[in-house]
């Protein structure tokens, strides 16, 4: 049987980073990836017409220091997300133009939204992102959903609806599905609500010219034969002295294991002996967001001619969030849209033809008749992905953080955990994935060093 010091499971940014860090420390390591590619929830494809389609995660922004440093180290070029012109809010059949992260067309709604952003960020900054369960009111915050909080506020209906749309876009899940404590942790992890929803000086500021997946591709090139694709892990036999990792094509013995995949997928691996009941409860109570991401390609970015940025929020239709996805090196115009949360779940049950027709109808309502005749259409339903089962990130149901949260990053014997869901900073983002991989590698390295000293 093949043997190594460490087996890493999952070839996304967390697993790739952990593997590279261990290699740098002189530790033998093998990375097992279930797919035929690396990148996890980043997936960049250049289509036949030359259009770069970012099916998965794509943006980076200020304070995401680890991913920005890695992009620079790997020699990747970036460009700024297009944001010139006015954003658009479609509400109650009316088009309202505005600048900035928050719609300003309705003064009452704008004032309420500012208050809401301040309130949520203020509450979030009280959370210790390394231990949300230690907040003095953690149980109370964890007992309610985001929807419960929204309904309890005195904001106008328009502001409440926009906050719901924001929730679906960020997580993406229904406000009634997410613990308020989880939402506050998430906002704290990203530095505040406004920093997470904006473009300029915010999380959606920058894109990688060759696509975000190229970060993973270049990391993979450094691993050589330590990377094994098409190797879904089905069982981990573990003891105090090590583990045997069984995948579909063989088995590998290791001293330590890093499981760098979402909790939902980690819970589908068979463990012998089984995980404790409480650890299994944690994976049972984590769920992935639901999103179907679409790219609609036009001969030119015609919306710019009327002074629009391409960033739209809508209270109607399946596509309720859009951005200008056009590449500066290309002449075509591209709108990227998101069918989030329950809208995404509904959309995946439609036929491809009906779904495409509804997307185009949504864009016609938002951008006018010029949107009726795209030259290409691409989509990806992340909830249908066997080795993701959703995106952008795993979330906690009410009551989970306050009772089971301490187990999230706690090793189980020789098994360690990584992945953006375990990140303290920029949880759910590429930056968080990288940080989690670095942390897991350091944890494993320290454990192996202690074992050597004991010997």
What are these regions (language model features)?
Residues 4, 17, 25, 99, ...:
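Conserved flavin/dinucleotide-binding core of flavoenzymes
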Residues 4-31:
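N-terminal Rossmann-like FAD-binding beta1-loop-alpha1 element of flavoenzymes
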Residues 7-9, 32, 233, 251-264:
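Short hydrophobic core segments
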Residues 23-48:
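Glycine-rich FAD pyrophosphate-binding loop
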Residues 51-123:
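Dinucleotide-binding Rossmann-like beta1-alpha1 core, especially the glycine-rich loop
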Residues 129-232, 239-243, 260, 270, ...:
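Active-site/ligand-binding neighborhood in enzyme catalytic cores
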Residues 237-252:
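Conserved beta-strand-loop-beta-strand element in the redox core of flavoprotein oxidoreductases
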Residues 259-278:
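Flavin (primarily FAD) binding-site architecture
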